[in-house]
């Protein structure tokens, strides 16, 4: 696993592929950021259920000013910390108001999102596939009006996953094997 483009292009990232940690493949990551490149540079990117942190690190590499890595699994948090350190990226933990470019939030995703008081430009949501966390994430994003008017929500889902998109508009869906990336926009503009 590596950083695909930008400031840290080609740098390798630490990871372990386990039943609960499924790092996004480089080819999917490249397609994701190619699709989103017109939005960069951006202010706020959120990597929800961050795992290894590779998606958030890619966002930093491509010019995101601040990335929030939301991950409550302590082993995964250690991987994110190691990856940020290996790239020389300054980070803070559990400080929503930090000025550092990377902020690791080691709390439940609902708690983390509930504490946000700033608008999000892009959020990448990749929870455990068998969970109802897609619906819960989208619901809190809508209820708290956390997305910028031009904001994009990206869901990484397995084939045939059903979810409630609330008032978010499905812009496009792209398939990569058994994984799908679904792009949603804020339709409450």
Regions found by a protein language model. Give the residues of each.
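Class I S-adenosyl-L-methionine-dependent methyltransferase catalytic core
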Residues: 1-189
